[in-house]
Structures are given as C-alpha cells and as structure tokens.
A protein has these predicted regions:
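Conserved SAM-binding loop of SAM-dependent methyltransferases across substrates and taxa
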Residues: 11-24
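Helix-to-beta-strand junctions that scaffold the AdoMet/dcAdoMet cofactor pocket
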Residues: 22, 94-96
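S-adenosyl-L-methionine
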Residues: 30, 37-70
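A short SAM/SAH-binding and catalytic strip from SAM-dependent methyltransferases
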Residues: 72-87, 91-92, 106
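Conserved beta-strand signature within the Rossmann-like core of class I S-adenosyl-L-methionine
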Residues: 97-107
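Active-site capping/gating segments
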Residues: 106-158
C-alpha cells in the first residue's frame, strides 16, 4: 500500500505514526518547508523507520507531475485549509478506487455541504465522518473519508 501524507505534513502527523504501526506501507511525506523535511528525515533515522520518500515542495506543483498524479492508495491531510481547497490539493494524488482522508474541526458538516461541487468535479464520493473525542479536551475533531471514483481533470490542482 502506498500512502501520501500530502499537504503540510508538518511534524509528520499522521504519516510517521502510521509508518511506525504499519511497517509494510510505502509512505511519501510532502511539505513546502525544507526545515520540516530535514526534521522528519532526522526523526525517521533516529526512530529507525525507513521506506519513506521525503519531498520538499507544494502539493499544487507535485499533483500535476505524472510520477505522483493518481498513484497513491491513500492521501491524508491535516486541517490546513478549507475542505474544497484541501480536496483540490490532495485528490489528484489518489488513484481511482483509493481514498482521501482528512482531519477537520467542528465545522466539518458545513464544510462537507460547501464541498459538494468540488467532490463532483474532482471525482470523489463522501464515505464517512468519524467523530474523535480526545481525553481532557472539549474540542470537536472529525476524520472525513472520501473514495475516488473517477479521474481528476488535468487542470487540478490549480
């Protein structure tokens, strides 16, 4: 299985914990800040995890490249942008039949409503919303799961 932690991997979540738990996956981490990529390379070396591709760049650039476009089983993202924009950055990486999984906050239902046109254009269907309750926190976290059902038009991401 090939997973891309596509947009703003930051400190490596959820990519690095997934790779630690699931040793058989291939993982690609993409971030626009080289210092984050350098940090993640050092962390993975110290922890002893391999089979990770680190990319310094932007999703909107790499999502257009044939070697990355529609090649991944799963793309993940944290809540770094509104859902329609996040989908535009991530969905082009996912192969048909694969999944886009993202973390969203308390406005997840509203963002889903605002994303219906983007879902249709980008070729994904909404599958599930998983509510996450964290101990000692009153914050509302949601994991949204989408399945890619058709190829994304070449003009995306813009």
């Amino acid at each position: 299985m090939c997973i891309r932690d596509s947009v703003g991997t930051g400190a490596g979540f959820p990519g690095l914990p997934l790779r630690i738990c699931l040793r058989n996956i291939e993982l690609t981490l993409l971030d626009s800040l080289n210092k984050r990529i350098n940090f993640l390379q050092e962390v993975s070396k110290q922890v002893g995890i391999d089979n990770i591709e680190f990319i310094h760049g932007r999703a909107e650039d790499f999502g257009k490249l044939e070697e990355y476009r529609e090649k991944y089983d799963i793309a993940t993202a944290r809540a770094v942008a509104g859902l329609p924009i996040l989908m535009e950055f991530c969905v082009p990486f996912v192969k048909v039949g694969g999944y886009f999984v993202c973390l969203k906050g308390p406005n997840a239902n509203l963002e889903l409503e605002e994303s219906k046109a983007a879902m249709d254009v980008l070729g994904v269907e909404f599958i599930e919303k998983i509510n996450i309750e964290l101990p000692e926190s009153d914050l509302n976290h949601n994991i949204l799961v989408f399945k890619k059902v058709k190829n994304t038009p070449d003009k995306y991401p813009r």
